[in-house]
Amino acid sequence: MKRTFQPSNLVRKRRHGFRARMATKAGRKILNARRARGRKSLSA
């Protein structure tokens, strides 16, 4: 059977990248939460 995780850097960036996060209000909320928490990496 086909595995569920088929890695693709392009899809990864488009779906979870910084620009994708900044594009929506909810995404900006995620980034702010990760900043507040002191995450080293904010997004993919």
Swiss-Prot record:
In terms of Pfam families, this protein maps to: Ribosomal_L34
The organism's superkingdom is given as Bacteria
Instruction: Supply one GO molecular-function term.
Output: structural constituent of ribosome
Q: Is Magnesium included in the keywords of this UniProt record?
A: no
Q: Does the keyword Coiled coil apply?
A: no
Gene Ontology terms describing biological process? translation
Q: Which UniProt keywords apply?
A: Ribonucleoprotein, Ribosomal protein
Q: What cellular-component terms does GO give this entry?
A: ribonucleoprotein complex; ribosome
Q: What InterPro entries would the database entry show?
A: Ribosomal_bL34, Ribosomal_bL34_CS
Family listed: Belongs to the bacterial ribosomal protein bL34 family.
Under the heading NCBIfam families, the entry gives: rpmH_bact (TIGR01030)
Would you tell me the protein name for this molecule? Large ribosomal subunit protein bL34
Q: Write the lineage as a comma-separated list.
A: Bacteria, Pseudomonadati, Pseudomonadota, Alphaproteobacteria, Rhodobacterales
Give me the gene this protein comes from.
Answer: rpmH
